[in-house]
């Protein structure tokens, strides 16, 4: 009996710190730990590649605004954003890592928020678009995708731009699409090297490679199904981390107002827009 009581007391003592930690608010946990754990997508140029990029700069700046350190949690995207939110924001991965305090680069979309009630999406910091870059000497004007017929065009096949081009005009462009590129940055480099006359991808990808080169024009992809206004990207935290969400929102507004946010994008050759 006495042994069972001792074991019960020991178990209670061990559990007490964990229980107290769980009782802390999201912001209080960050401050107690002394660092903001930030989830970052692997291999997402120009936002994150091997510990560098716009999202890495932004993660550090947000942590500095909260007066804590930063701990980066890079991860590979799963099959859906909902999976990423589950693994990185509100539950953690089944392999034992996560969750983070905040996930970067989350689409700020009502449908996504409604479908994921355990998370809070906030602090939009950039507006992304699907775009196409072209060599001006080869394609002075690009009013429609019909001008690309019979011309080599680089695009990542497993991307929104790739999906739009592969299905455009009943598949009329398929024969000359080069889709083996891993992302829009690689496609843009192929264009810069003269391998193709145009490259499609996200505006940020193309601008980071070609934005300063007057030989090329970068414009919205003239495809009827392309989101004309693009989409905002922001951050996500657990739904009940209200004080952390408010602190991050204030921090983002401060970075925007001071010009620091725009400077982060400019350092990567990407014009900041929201």
Annotate each predicted stretch with a short phrase.
Residues 24-101:
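Extracytoplasmic small-molecule ligand-binding "clamshell" domains
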Residues 83, 102-115, 164-167, 192-229:
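A ligand-binding cleft/hinge motif common to bilobed small-molecule-binding domains
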Residues 73-146:
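Acidic, polar ligand-binding/catalytic clefts
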Residues 37, 51-64, 129-182:
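Bilobed "Venus flytrap"/periplasmic-binding protein-like clamshell domains
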Residues 56-65, 136-139, 146, 151-152, ...:
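Extended ligand-binding regions for polar small-molecule ligands
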Residues 41-42, 126-131, 210-252, 269-274:
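Periplasmic-binding protein-like
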Residues 5-21:
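N-terminal export signals
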Residues 39-44, 73-77, 92-110, 159, ...:
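Beta->alpha turn/N-cap motifs
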């Amino acid at each position: 009996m006495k042994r069972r009581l001792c074991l019960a007391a020991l178990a209670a003592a061990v559990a007490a710190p964990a229980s107290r930690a769980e009782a802390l608010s999201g912001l209080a946990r960050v401050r107690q730990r002394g660092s903001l754990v930030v989830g970052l997508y692997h291999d997402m140029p120009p936002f994150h590649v091997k510990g560098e990029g716009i999202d890495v700069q932004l993660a550090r700046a947000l942590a500095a605004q909260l007066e804590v350190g930063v701990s980066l949690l890079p991860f590979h995207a799963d099959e859906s954003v909902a999976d990423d939110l589950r693994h990185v924001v509100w539950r953690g991965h089944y392999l034992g890592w996560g969750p983070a305090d905040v996930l970067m680069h989350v689409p700020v979309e009502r449908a996504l928020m409604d479908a994921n009630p355990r998370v809070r999406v906030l602090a939009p910091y950039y507006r992304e678009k699907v775009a196409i870059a072209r060599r001006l000497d080869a394609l002075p004007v690009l009013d429609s995708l019909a001008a690309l017929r019979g011309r080599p065009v680089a695009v990542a096949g497993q991307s929104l731009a790739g999906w739009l081009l592969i299905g455009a005009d009943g598949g009329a462009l398929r024969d000359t699409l080069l889709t083996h590129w891993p992302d829009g940055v690689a496609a843009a480099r192929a264009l810069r090297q003269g391998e193709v006359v145009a490259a499609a991808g996200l505006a940020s990808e193309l601008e980071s490679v070609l934005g300063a080169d007057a030989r090329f024009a970068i414009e919205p992809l003239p495809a009827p199904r392309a989101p004309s206004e693009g989409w905002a990207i922001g951050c996500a935290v657990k739904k009940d981390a209200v004080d952390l969400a408010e602190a991050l929102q204030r921090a983002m507004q401060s970075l925007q107002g001071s010009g620091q946010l725009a400077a982060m994008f400019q350092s990567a050759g990407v014009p900041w827009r929201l």
